Amino acid sequence: MVKIDGFHKNTVQYNRAFSEMLRPAKEQLKHLSPDNIAQRSGAVFYEENAVLELQSLNQRVRITVPEYTCSPKLEEWHQLVILHYLALADGTAVSEQIITFGGLKDGLIRGSKFDHDMEKELRGFLSRKTPDGIRKICKALGAEFTDSNADLCAVFHFLPNYPSG
């Protein structure tokens, strides 16, 4: 019997969870026309190359159709969120209201251990940064800063037309 250490066990679970969510995301997209996806999501569809293109976290992301693979190569969960977004976007304009995927009527990404782990990691990452350091990181990701009651409020243009459920 092979003993699996905690890291590899978590990696296997992580990859299995990703794979289990990637399949339905791609399947949903295959039932939609690329022109319709582009219209509802704010992406641009280049028919001659069969590529959808959109801006996410200050980078231009290209998604091949009908394979629905992203380039440049993105972290798996970023790719998954973009694919679900393309399937769910309904053309709703960006607002300043915070909406989570788990809060959406048909959201495929629900509150989970992953959400909790990411929140914990982000909190740990940011706690070691100065306000100027955080501002530089936000700016590198394409954030726009806005006035609020918070010490720092940044708006990230992660997905252009988020579905409002």
Label every PLM stretch briefly.
Residues 1-2, 164-165:
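Acidic, proline/glycine-rich low-complexity IDRs
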Residues 2-49, 93-147:
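Short Lys/Arg-enriched alpha/beta "domain-start" segment
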Residues 24, 34, 66, 72, ...:
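Proline-rich intrinsically disordered, low-complexity coils
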Residues 36-62, 146-164:
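Amphipathic, interaction-prone secondary-structure segments
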Residues 55-116:
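Aromatic- and glycine-enriched beta-alpha-beta binding-site module
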